[in-house]
Amino acid sequence: MRRAALRLCTLSKGLLAPSRGLTQESQNPENVFHIREVRDKLREIVGASTNWRDHVKAMEERKLLHSFLAKSQKGLPPRTMKDSYIEVFLPLGSQPELREKYLTVQNTVRFGRILEDLDSLGVLICYMHNKIHSAKMSPLSIVTALVDKIDMCKKNLSPEQDIKFSGHVSWVGKTSMEVKMHMFQLHGNDFSPVLDATFVMVARDSENKGPAFVNPLILESPEEEELFQQGELNKGRRVAFSSTSLLKMAPTAEERTTIHEMFLNTLDPKTISFRSRVLPANSVWMENSKLKSLDICHPQERNIFNRIFGGFLMRKAYELGWATACNFGGSRPFIVAVDDIMFQKPVEVGSLLFLSAQVCFTQGNYIQVRVHSEVASLQDKEHMTTNVFHFTFMSEKEVPLVFPRTYGESMLYLDGQRHFKSMSAPVTLKRNYVVEP
């Protein structure tokens, strides 16, 4: 499993390596940012207010940008991958005053903060792709639709070494874009790969009420064509995964056998009854692995469109997931992969955010954690699902098995097993790239 995660990271690295033109763009100052400049640049692009009291006025001004929206994609100039390529530096080593925000008690880097930075970076990359030179502000409202996959190459990050992010648009539909992002950390004189991330972003109109067209993408090399093809494969994989969801289809024969065998293993051998259940040795009931949290969504956590920042939601979910894995495994867990985070509904400022995390699958040293996110307004007590997060952690020691007691928990177990197995089954391309051991 660990080798599989590393393979995914080195595979993506191999894809970008032949396309040296993408990295050459870093010589352009307009494509290089300090981490503090990213959010400021986004506010400038959309004309967002810096004060909460002015947010209504700012949103009213954005309505005037509706005339700049294209009627069709054909009316938009095509862009290249180089047009959207940017680099962002997080100088933890050379600017120690930045460390406090990113520091863990174990003297490593907070991965939740990295998720926030990746979310902001992905949005900025898409605005670079759809840049309108004749307009000061963009008429598009670009938001994160899906975190397709994040794969880690390293277990630990040093808070005393500089970090670099890079990324660009790798696939474009009519109103959506796939963004490839990479993170590196300085070791000696070189930046070593830390993670690869694939996000899917969607473009909305200036009022964030309906879809908007994005600039088409021109492919300039065989490597870029392969990146685009991988985007097509990713889209197909997501459709296939969704169509076979346990919310739509019954488990496979193999999965049904797995659940039945687990059920039989929990029957009390002293009685001949389906009602008497006992927990096998070195095991935990799934219902006992839960942790929950509640947050009030204050204006401080808003995004440039005055909804709650998606990176904040990911950070809170990750931190609860990490705590759940730590509590379950009894030792410090390390994040291995993040996948299939669908942003189903925006979270309004002032909402109550309910997070519920539980271990749904384990194998060896690995813990699959599912975090369910719900919101409720202060006026309306109805809860609505906004996100479901899937995190794969690796513990320092072997962890107990987790056993479901109900049919619903059995489905969560199988869903967790599917997400875990997907880590070792990356999308394969025609060309055979050399994979580091």
From Swiss-Prot:
Q: Which domain of life is it from?
A: Eukaryota
Q: In which pathway does it act?
A: Lipid metabolism; fatty acid metabolism
Q: Transit peptide: where? A: 1-21
Name where it's found: Mitochondrion; Mitochondrion matrix; Mitochondrion inner membrane
Residue positions of the PTM N6-acetyllysine?
101
Start and end residues of each HotDog ACOT-type domain: 84-207, 287-399
Q: What is its main location?
A: mitochondrion
Q: Mind listing the UniProt keywords for this protein, alphabetically?
A: Acetylation, Hydrolase, Membrane, Mitochondrion, Mitochondrion inner membrane, Repeat, Serine esterase, Transit peptide
One GO cellular-component annotation of the UniProt record comes to: mitochondrion
* PROSITE patterns in the record: HOTDOG_ACOT
Record entry for activity regulation: Strongly inhibited by NADH and CoA.
Which terms does the record give in the GO molecular function aspect? carboxylic ester hydrolase activity; fatty acyl-CoA hydrolase activity
Q: Name one GO biological process term.
A: short-chain fatty acid metabolic process
| Family statement drawn from the similarity comment of this UniProt entry | Belongs to the acyl coenzyme A hydrolase family.
Assembly and partners are described as: Interacts with NYAP1, NYAP2 and MYO16.
Query: Which function does this protein serve?
Result: Mitochondrial acyl-CoA thioesterase. Catalyzes the hydrolysis of acyl-CoAs into free fatty acids and coenzyme A (CoA), regulating their respective intracellular levels. Regulates both mitochondrial lipid and amino acid metabolism.
> What is the protein name stated in its UniProt record?
Acyl-coenzyme A thioesterase 9, mitochondrial
User: What is the organism field in this record?
Assistant: Bos taurus
